[in-house]
Amino acid sequence: MRAALPPARLLPLLLLLALLGAPAARASRAQSAAPPQPGAERQPRPPPGPGPGNATGTGSGEAAGGGGSSNSSGDALVTRISSLLRDLHTLKAAVIVACAFTAFLIACLLLRVFRSGKRLKKTRKYDIITTPAERVEMAPLNEEDDEDEDSTVFDIKYR
């Protein structure tokens, strides 16, 4: 069973939650504090008459019903667009946080790649030579012991 997250890992999560929550709280406070603007939320209403909900038996209920359904879908579209425009600051903040988090991840991965590349270039002792021969200089370390060719140790320098 895993224990609680260490503080070093918990801090970025708390920061992310604070960044996501702050614009939403600020927008809800601004909406409740701001007085309603005249004409901003005013929608043209269809004239009262026979519609799908209050059709009278005296006439063309089908014609009025068709006009009412197209108008209600238009109202739904206007309502959806106005709600998106109202929450624009929250959406903008969420996109900025997502982009910043993605940039942070890319930077971490690049740092990890460059650090691992430095580790691969360290001097390897007693290893198989995989570098092409024209880029390698080899000199025997034990020059005085030439009778046994199989046990010669070489000093390798890469160009």
Curated annotation (Swiss-Prot):
Annotated stretches, region: Disordered: 28-73
Location(s) in or outside the cell: Cell membrane; Golgi apparatus
Annotated InterPro entries: FAM174-like (IPR009565)
Membrane-traversing stretches: 91-111
Keywords associated with the record: Cell membrane, Glycoprotein, Golgi apparatus, Membrane, Signal, Transmembrane, Transmembrane helix
Record carries keyword Cell inner membrane: no
GO biological process: one example: Golgi organization
Principal location class: membrane
Superkingdom of origin: Eukaryota
Signal peptide: 1-27
Record field: compositional bias (Gly residues): 52-69
Keyword Glycoprotein: yes
Membrane topology classification: Single-pass type I membrane protein
GO cellular component assignments: Golgi apparatus; plasma membrane
Ranges of the Cytoplasmic topological domain: 112-159
Glycosylated sites: 54
Family: Belongs to the FAM174 family.
UniProt-recorded name of the protein: Membrane protein FAM174B
Organism lineage string: Eukaryota, Metazoa, Chordata, Craniata, Vertebrata
